[in-house]
Amino acid sequence: SSRGKRHAENLTPQIEFVLEQARISMDEISVVAVDVGPGLYTGLRVGITTAVSVAFGLGVPMIGVTSLDLLAYPVRYCSKLIVATIDARRGEVFHANYLQVPGGVQRVSEPAVSTPDDLAADLLAHGDEALLVGDGALRYSETFAVLRGVDAAEPNIAYPSADSIVQLAHAKALREEFVTPTELE
């Protein structure tokens, strides 16, 4: 896809820009973190392949963080059920549920894919107050807007952020929760 091609073309310059902004060189990197999805296939493959190449080239371990975890983390102070959503295209959303815990969020459901209507029905059936975050919530806002006690997070946090991956990957690195390239395929 053209979007995947743009991602491939922009990724290396973006890495160089971040290194420059942080005033560090590539050889100062001790671990490589990567968003492992769910998400659109081409963009994920480009990101994962780049991360594997960098980690292999530097001889450092890797950490994988899911996109849904990355979406839930910025709203970690919310006391409601947090539902991270990603537009899966074709009228579906990837989603997982989270609860606030000391220091972050804990996933309380396995990542799943369903139609927005099915997700809305599940939320209605459980009756919990919830905060929806992610581009799936934005894309299908009309489906979720009618649910009582269900709010949408601000659009500015609808996509995984570099800040979140740094925070979550750092915690995983301290616990030595490393992954191998074959685990990411």
Question: Model features per residue range: what roles?
Answer:
Residues 1-38:
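N-terminal beta-alpha supersecondary unit
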Residues 18-22, 57, 75, 162-173:
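Stable alpha-helical structural segments in soluble proteins, enriched in small hydrophobic residues
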Residues 21-27, 56-65, 178:
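Phosphate-handling active-site elements
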Residues 25-30, 109, 152, 175:
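Acidic, glycine-enriched active-site microenvironments
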Residues 34-62:
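DPxDG-like acidic metal-binding loop motif
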Residues 61-160:
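Surface "functional belts" at beta-alpha junctions
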Residues 153-185:
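Acyltransferase
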